[in-house]
């Protein structure tokens, strides 16, 4: 039996759910500036596959890396950590 490689997982906030079966997740990453050493917040967006259209804007979600599903989609929804109020 072939074992799969480890998949990257990210936690972020849903910023768009206007597409069918797709959500846009904003992930905040704290990186150290190479010269000055200050911790800087960097935000990047991922398109993720949401098969049942269950996410809404403001939800905190966990996404996992997967095979390419379209031109921009390389992540899929694993779980909804917290629903939006």
From Swiss-Prot:
This is Small ribosomal subunit protein uS17. Keywords: Ribonucleoprotein, Ribosomal protein, RNA-binding, rRNA-binding. GO terms for molecular function: rRNA binding; structural constituent of ribosome. Belongs to the universal ribosomal protein uS17 family. GO terms for cellular component: cytosolic small ribosomal subunit. GO terms for biological process: translation. Pfam families: Ribosomal_S17. Signal peptide: none annotated. InterPro entries: NA-bd_OB-fold (IPR012340), Ribosomal_uS17 (IPR000266), Ribosomal_uS17_bact/chlr (IPR019984), Ribosomal_uS17_CS (IPR019979). One of the primary rRNA binding proteins, it binds specifically to the 5'-end of 16S ribosomal RNA. PANTHER family: 40S RIBOSOMAL PROTEIN S11 FAMILY MEMBER, SMALL RIBOSOMAL SUBUNIT PROTEIN US17M. Part of the 30S ribosomal subunit. The keyword Ribosomal protein applies.
């Amino acid at each position: 039996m072939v074992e799969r490689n480890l998949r990257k997982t990210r936690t972020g906030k849903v910023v768009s759910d206007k597409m069918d079966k797709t959500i846009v997740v904003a992930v905040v990453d704290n990186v150290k500036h190479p010269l000055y050493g200050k911790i800087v917040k960097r935000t990047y967006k991922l398109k993720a596959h949401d098969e049942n259209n269950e996410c809404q804007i403001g939800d905190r979600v966990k996404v996992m890396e997967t095979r390419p599903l379209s031109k921009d989609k390389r992540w899929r929804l694993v779980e909804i950590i917290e629903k939006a109020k």
